[in-house]
Amino acid sequence: MASYLFRVKADWDPRNLWRDIVIGGARSLEDLHRAINTSFEIGFDHLWFFGTNRDFWRSRKMYKSPKDFENLPKWMEYWDRLSGRSEAETNAAGVSIDELNLKVGDRLCYLFDYADEWRFYLILKKILEDEPSQKEPVIVKGKGEIFG
């Protein structure tokens, strides 16, 4: 397999606030979430999701924080069944980067904290065929600080 180079941009200031992150394809979306939050120094104490569309809340597929699945109310379980979503499809901890079948130029959205809505989007810049698929996430370049 391979590793992937993503440019992660803050939606509110994409030219001045971004990070380049390399991550192995066998790594989970939860691993990517941790790399993003570490690189922007925003913590880990809120719910989050990755989406496949540019419109965050209207994404056809949402890969959510594992905490989204803890102690779900019954109506949420019912909604997931009706919508055709199963935990395996939507729990980000169980989805690898490889499983997304991304091509160079494809985009993902990432939303952290459902109340404050820290919005980021990711662009796949390069597929690194010679890098191992188990590669730990690495921040290779960046610009700007959120709290600076």
Model feature map: region roles:
Residues M1-G148:
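Short linear regulatory motifs enriched in tryptophan with gly/pro/ser
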